[in-house]
Amino acid sequence: MTMLKDPSKKYRAFPTIDLPDRTWPSKTIDAVPIWCSSDLRDGNQSLIEPMDAAKKLRFWKTLVSVGVKEIEASFPSASQTDFDFVRTLIEDGHIPDDTTIQVLTQAREDLIARTFESLRGAKKAIVHLYNATCPSFRRIVFNQDKAGVKEIAVNAAKLFVKYAAQQPETQWTFQYSPETFSATELEFAKEVCDAVIEVWNPTPENKVILNLPATVEVATPNIYADQIEWFGRNITRRDSVLISLHTHNDRGTGVAATELGLMAGADRVEGCLFGNGERTGNVDLVTVALNLYTQGINPGLDFSDIDGVRKVVEECNQIPVHPRHPYVGDLVHTAFSGSHQDAIRKGFTQQKEGELWEVPYLPIDPADIGRSYEAVIRVNSQSGKGGIAYLLEQEYGISLPRRMQIEFSQVVQGETDRLGLEMTAEQIHSLLRREYLQANVPYALISHKLQEENGNSSVDAEVHVDGETQHWRGKGKGALEALVAGLPVAVEIMDYNEHAIGSGTTAKAAAYIELRVNGERAVHGVGIDENITTASFRALFSALNRSLSQTQAKAA
C-alpha cells in the first residue's frame, strides 16, 4: 500500500472554530502556569519497560528538586505496584508540604474507591477523573450516546464527593478531563463539564481543575487555542475553575499548542520532562518552561543542572534524549559551521556581564542551565577561523591575530578533510604546536644573548643549522630588528602581536609574527615562552622556517 494521491478520500480536515472575535493572537504569556508532571503516570504507562518502585522514587525526587508542585504519581487502581508507590510516598514522607500528589482513575466505583484508599493519610491530593467524550470514542469504543457519556461523568463525580467525605483530614482537589477534548464538539464538552461542576460545587477558594486534553493532536495549534478561549468564555463558574492543558505531539506541535493555549487563557499545564508519553509523547515541560525563561519570565522550575535531570530521565525511561532536542540535546548549543562559529565567537567577545543576552545563534546562555562553553564550538570540515580561534582562546589562552586565524584555519581544514572527522580543542592545539611551535627546520634557535645600550640592541643568537652550531649576530633599534639584521636571508616583518597567557608568576608570553622572506608570500609564526623577548624570537624562527619549507616544497 502506498500514500494516496487524493488523501481527502480517507482523511478530513478538522473544522475550524467559529470565533471571529478571538483575542488570543494579540496576547502574550506574562504569567507562569501551574506545572503538573505526568511522567510517573502518562509517561510511565508509555514505556516498553515501566519503571520499578526505585526508579519511580528517584524520578519523583528529581521532579521535587526541579520545583514541580503538582505531580501525577500513578494510576493506583491499575496495579498493586502503582497503589504501593502512592502509599510509599505518603507513609515515608516523600511529599513536601508545598507539593501535591495527583492520581488518576476511571469512572467506575470500585476503581474510584481503590484510588481514594491509596491516598489515605495524604495532607492534600488531586484526584483526576476522566472519560472520553468525542464522537469516534462514543460510537466505536463505548457504543454510548451523548447522554450516556454525560451520565458516566456525573455519576463518577458524585462518587468523588462520597469518598472524599470519608477522609476529611485530606485537602481534596478534584480534576475532570473530558478525554479527547480537542476532538469533541465544544458545546458537548462544555455540557459535560458544566454537569460535573454542578456536582462538585467549587468556589474561588476551592477550585476544580478542568483538564482539556489534545489526547491525540488532530489540528493546528491555533484551533486548539480557539477551543481553549471558547471554553474559558462559556464554561460555568469560570472564577472557580482552573483550565488545564494536556497536549500531545502527534503533529509535532505540542509545545506550540500549549503556548497558544496559555495565550488563550489557560491556567495550568500537564506534561512530561523532555516530552515522553504515549505515541509521539506529551508536551515537553522543559521546553515550555525554558521558552518562558528566554522571554525574561522565571518559570518557577529550576533547570540549572539540565544534564543531571536528563541523566535521571534517560536512565528511568530507558529512552535517550535526542541530540537535537531543544535546550538539552548534546548538539543544540554546538556550531560546526564556520560562519556560525565566527558570529558566536564575536558575540562572546562583546557580551558583557549583566547585559541582555545577544550572542548570535544561542537563544539561551548555556551556563544558565549548567552547560559549559566547551562544546559550543566544535570543528569539522565545515568550520571556519572563528571556531578554531575560539577553542584555542577558551581552552589554552591563545588569541590568534586575525590574519593568522585565516592561515591556520586552512591548516585545520586540510587536517579535517584528511581525517574525515571533527577535531577537538586538544587536537587543534596539537596541530598548532606541530605546525608552528615545532617549526625548527632548517634553523633551530638554541639560545641568545641580548645587550641594550643607548636605545640600541645587539643580539648574538646560537642557531642549529644542518647538524652544526652557528652564531648569528645583528644590531638594531630593538631586539627583533637586531635579530632580523643577523639573519642570512632577507626578512620583512609585516605584523607583530603579543599577549600574556595566564597571570602571576606562572604566566607565559605568546608572540605572533607575520613576515615575508625574500619577497615571498607572507606567513605566520608563533612563539611561547616565559620571557617575552624569547617568545618573539621563537615566533620569528617559526615563521622563517615555515616560509622556507613552503618555498622548498613549491620548488619540488
Curated annotation (Swiss-Prot):
UniProt KW keywords: Amino-acid biosynthesis, Branched-chain amino acid biosynthesis, Cytoplasm, Leucine biosynthesis, Magnesium, Metal-binding, Transferase
Matches recorded under PROSITE patterns: AIPM_HOMOCIT_SYNTH_1 (PS00815), AIPM_HOMOCIT_SYNTH_2 (PS00816), PYR_CT (PS50991)
Cofactor: Mg(2+)
Enzyme Commission designation: 2.3.3.13
Domain Pyruvate carboxyltransferase: 33-307
Region (Regulatory domain): 439-556
InterPro entries hit by this protein: 2-isopropylmalate_synth_dimer, AIPM/Hcit_synth_CS, Aldolase_TIM, IPM_Synthase, LeuA-like_post-cat, LeuA_allosteric_dom_sf, LeuA_N_DRE-TIM, PYR_CT
Binding site for Mg(2+): D42, H246, H248, N282
Keyword flag Iron: no
Localization of this protein: Cytoplasm
Molecular function terms, GO-annotated: 2-isopropylmalate synthase activity; acetyl-CoA C-acetyltransferase activity; magnesium ion binding
GO CC entries: cytoplasm
CDD domains tied to this protein: DRE_TIM_LeuA
Pfam families: HMGL-like, IPMS_D2, LeuA_dimer
The keyword Nucleotidyltransferase is assigned to this record: no
Reaction(s) catalysed (UniProt annotation): 3-methyl-2-oxobutanoate + acetyl-CoA + H2O = (2S)-2-isopropylmalate + CoA + H(+)
Signal peptide feature range: none
Name of the top EC class for this enzyme: transferase
Pathway in which this enzyme or protein is active: Amino-acid biosynthesis; L-leucine biosynthesis; L-leucine from 3-methyl-2-oxobutanoate: step 1/4
Any one GO biological process: L-leucine biosynthetic process
Protein's job: Catalyzes the condensation of the acetyl group of acetyl-CoA with 3-methyl-2-oxobutanoate (2-ketoisovalerate) to form 3-carboxy-3-hydroxy-4-methylpentanoate (2-isopropylmalate).
Family: Belongs to the alpha-IPM synthase/homocitrate synthase family. LeuA type 2 subfamily.
Assembly description: Homodimer.
The protein's name: 2-isopropylmalate synthase
Species in which this protein is naturally found: Pseudomonas syringae pv. syringae (strain B728a)
